[in-house]
A protein has these predicted regions:
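Structural motif
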Residues: 28, 55-57, 95-98, 139, ...
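C-terminal regulatory domains involved in ligand/effector binding and gene-expression control
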Residues: 1-78, 165, 192
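Short amphipathic alpha-helix segments
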Residues: 143-160
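Conserved short beta-strand edge segments in small beta-sheet-based binding/regulatory domains
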Residues: 162-168, 192-200
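Short glycine-/aliphatic-rich beta-strand segments at the starts of folded cytosolic domains
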Residues: 131-146, 174-176
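Terminal, non-globular segments
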Residues: 176, 182-185
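Signal for well-folded cores of large energy- and translation-related assemblies
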Residues: 46, 88-89, 119, 123-130, ...
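Active-site beta-strand/loop microenvironment that shapes enzyme catalytic pockets
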Residues: 80-128
């Protein structure tokens, strides 16, 4: 079971191909973070496969997996986007776009045939991808006076947040990133250091 502050995604673009009754289904799984990125990839693949009969897709965004869409691109309703999304869901993936391009082979597949083909093509692309589990991280900025540097650095060493930025004058600043589930503890420890202030 995935923890609340982790999610599964893919590291790089991966492809899969499925053929059924001379129809060719080319699937591309792409890691994405925003709707804008999704639009760019869709534009690029629609241009690349301009001669294809259909370019269908599904995506999932956000570590909570609540932002998703499935598109049939002219195929009968529910026969393309939904089975693609089903493969994303069965692998518990997010921040992912899966596009399936169909070249019609002259023989109709029927509704159930299309569902099987789009599902199989999406499964091939996802199977070819490297799936990783990532943490949901949060950032915090703390300001403190230089004489209390050792206290701050001891906490950083023990709790192991990533140091994103730091500046050392009489007033020092440090921007840190740590996994969401550990943020409460880190914040509480930093706030106990004399002169330390959390900057929102």
């Amino acid at each position: 079971m995935i923890q609340e502050d982790t999610y599964k995604t893919i590291t790089d673009i991966a492809e899969g191909i499925y053929t059924e009754k001379r129809s060719k289904f080319i699937a591309i799984a792409i890691p994405v973070r925003t709707i804008e990125e999704i639009k760019q990839h869709l534009d690029a693949y629609q241009k690349k496969y301009y001669d294809a009969r259909h370019v269908c897709y599904a995506y999932m965004l956000g570590h909570e997996r609540k932002d998703f869409r499935a598109n049939d691109n002219g195929e009968p309703s529910g026969t393309a986007g939904k089975p693609i999304l089903g493969q994303i869901n069965s692998n518990e993936l997010t921040v992912i776009l899966v596009i399936v391009v169909r070249y019609f082979g002259g023989i109709k597949l029927g509704t159930s045939g299309l569902i099987v083909a789009y599902k199989a093509a999406a499964a091939e692309a996802i199977a070819a991808a490297d799936i990783v589990e990532r943490t949901v991280d949060e950032e915090i900025t703390v300001s403190f006076e230089y004489p209390f540097m050792n206290d701050i650095m001891r906490i950083v060493k023990e709790d192991e947040p990533a140091i994103l930025e730091q500046s050392y004058d009489m007033d020092c600043l440090m921007r840190l990133r740590i996994r969401k589930s550990m943020m409460g503890k880190l914040r509480a420890r930093l706030e106990k250091v004399e002169t330390a202030r959390i900057i929102e």
